[in-house]
């Protein structure tokens, strides 16, 4: 993996790899993340440019990008995290690395999506008929 260990981009790429996920294309195709997805705030825009399905609603398994300078993120780079769970009230739990400079995986509950947050949706790399 070409992302620097402990950076937010590394954390999301590693989590997707661990779960066997790809980006979900607008037509249902599976799209690999690339080594040049950009800074955290760029991931959803890059996913869209690759044909990925994106939106403003959290879904479990989605990539979430935060605009730089919002939600406690660096102004220049923004942040990217992985949506682990969505709650009935619209809040969602993310796993992430390098939030607040911590290179380890941490979890954080986001109260709701807003205009500084966007999502790229994922799908399983392999499916079973069993």
Which residue ranges define each predicted feature?
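Secreted/periplasmic proteins that engage bacterial cell-wall peptidoglycan
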Residues: 1-85, 95-96
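A broad, low-specificity signal marking well-ordered, structured residues that form hydrophobic/aromatic
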Residues: 81, 92, 117
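Short, conserved beta-turn/loop elements at beta-strand boundaries and strand-helix junctions
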Residues: 86-90
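Short solvent-exposed strand/turn elements
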Residues: 91-111
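Intrinsically disordered, low-complexity, charged/polar segments
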Residues: 106-125
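Conserved small/polar residues in nucleotide/adenosyl-binding loops
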Residues: 126-130
């Amino acid at each position: 993996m070409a992302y620097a260990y402990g950076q937010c981009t590394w954390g999301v790429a590693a989590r997707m790899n661990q779960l066997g996920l790809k980006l979900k294309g607008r037509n249902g195709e599976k799209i690999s993340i690339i080594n040049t997805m950009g800074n955290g705030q760029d991931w959803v825009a890059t996913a869209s440019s690759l044909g990925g399905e994106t939106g403003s609603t959290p879904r479990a398994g989605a990539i979430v990008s935060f605009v730089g300078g919002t939600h406690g993120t660096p102004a220049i780079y923004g942040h990217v995290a992985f949506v682990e769970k969505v709650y009935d009230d619209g809040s969602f739990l993310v796993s992430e690395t390098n939030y607040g400079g911590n290179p380890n995986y941490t979890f954080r509950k986001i109260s709701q999506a807003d205009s500084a947050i966007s999502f790229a949706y994922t799908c399983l790399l392999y499916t079973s008929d069993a």
